[in-house]
Amino acid sequence: MDLLLLEKTLLGSFVAVLVAILVSKLRGKRFKLPPGPLPVPVFGNWLQVGDDLNHRNLTDLAKKFGDIFLLRMGQRNLVVVSSPDLSKEVLHTQGVEFGSRTRNVVFDIFTGKGQDMVFTVYGEHWRKMRRIMTVPFFTNKVVQQYRYGWEEEAAQVVEDVKKNPEAATNGIVLRRRLQLMMYNNMYRIMFDRRFESEDDPLFNKLKALNGERSRLAQSFDYNYGDFIPILRPFLRGYLKICQEVKERRLQLFKDYFVDERKKLASTKNMSNEGLKCAIDHILDAQKKGEINEDNVLYIVENINVAAIETTLWSIEWGIAELVNHPEIQKKLRHELDTLLGPGHQITEPDTYKLPYLNAVVKETLRLRMAIPLLVPHMNLHDAKLGGFDIPAESKILVNAWWLANNPAHWKNPEEFRPERFLEEGAKVEANGNDFRYLPFGVGRRSCPGIILALPILGITLGRLVQNFELLPPPGQSKIDTSEKGGQFSLHILKHSTIVAKPRSF
């Protein structure tokens, strides 16, 4: 009986392989597909390239196969684009055709199968969510309303670092205090709330759950089960943990923030003109029946990840580069002292008249792009790109990091050199006016958080350089800037200890 079962299993596997080969050949005849490594049945290219599809590995494949190539990852088609012209096609010219988002077994859990804004398919739900989120989060009015809070939070960082005797001697992990700052920046906007210190129990609970969510979602470890359905049973434990983390996070958002704001609103007479923070606008949309309670919580979910973490990564990278390039730090400090005057602390309006500071921010976002592959795109229907056929529901990755670090487009791209944005790249902006440089993407699915991230980066880096000489810890000439890439992320591998010596004015 066992022998018969084994024979049936082997026969079934053989037939499955034959069918896969036949389908592959039929598809090959029907489509003119982009080049790429030769796939094998069932597994595609997974056995060749593995799970770790980070920006540098995909860059190596682009050097071999060209500006557009195809990877067959199990049942999924993965198309990688690595040139400015093709990126323009995906993000702008054919922005509608390639405007959807791919499904992913882990992100399906964390977004309720696309009930959020960032990872939903292109269509009416996305347009509605984008509209509802834009007014309370992503307008110049919001910047002007909350920039005083950002300046206060940066000033509090400076004060706390000065109070810490370790900061000026052996150094501190500055990121920890900056993380509190970023949570306060965004929670002021969302809920008109802030956390008093790094020891706040609610802050620590929130930070831990968000960190676990980020670790689970950004890992490449689950790719095999996402790409190859027959291997998905091996992911059951992983997906169970994801579900548990998701439920705990959403319950935390609901109990401590959304419901608390509802109670406060019920005690006040709030008109549309009197809404004070983002969640009031969002709850108003819920009352009108435009969205449901789950949508409200997934909006909060998006902001916790997309706004807080990515900006924090960029701040951390900027500090690391300034520590490792003291001549650039000195030049930036000279600009701040000269144009603002010694002792005048930088404010949001000042950021527009400080060209070298802006160049430092741009260069940080170029060399250390927080989302190096942007958020993946997808075409719902068969499409054409670069003279090739792109089958429906292909995952499209734009290697924005390589666009910004390709020596064919940039002079000595491996160097951290802010001057490039004052010289040969003086007209290049972070808003996507040049398809060699897309730190926030461009087009319909671009990151609307650019309007918040740029001033927060400028204020934070400016205040730190104004008030401190930032140095590596004793015994080190530089700090470690090794990278840790993820599904949609690029952050520093080790949170470095930084010496912050106060300046006297």
Curated annotation (Swiss-Prot):
Pathway: Phenylpropanoid metabolism; trans-4-coumarate biosynthesis; trans-4-coumarate from trans-cinnamate: step 1/1. Its EC number is 1.14.14.91. SUPFAM superfamilies: Cytochrome P450. Its main location: membrane. The chain crosses the membrane at residues 3-23. It is a single-pass membrane protein. It comes from the Eukaryota. GO terms for molecular function: heme binding; iron ion binding; trans-cinnamate 4-monooxygenase activity. Keywords: Heme, Iron, Membrane, Metal-binding, Monooxygenase, Oxidoreductase, Transmembrane, Transmembrane helix. It is found in: Membrane. InterPro entries: Cyt_P450, Cyt_P450_CS, Cyt_P450_E_grp-I, Cyt_P450_sf. GO terms for cellular component: membrane. It catalyses: (E)-cinnamate + reduced [NADPH--hemoprotein reductase] + O2 = (E)-4-coumarate + oxidized [NADPH--hemoprotein reductase] + H2O + H(+). PROSITE patterns: CYTOCHROME_P450. One of its GO terms (biological process) is lignin metabolic process. Its cofactor is heme. Catalyzes the first oxidative step of the phenylpropanoid pathway in higher plants by transforming trans-cinnamate into p-coumarate. The compounds formed by this pathway are essential components for lignification, pollination, and defense against ultraviolet light, predators and pathogens. Belongs to the cytochrome P450 family. This is Trans-cinnamate 4-monooxygenase.
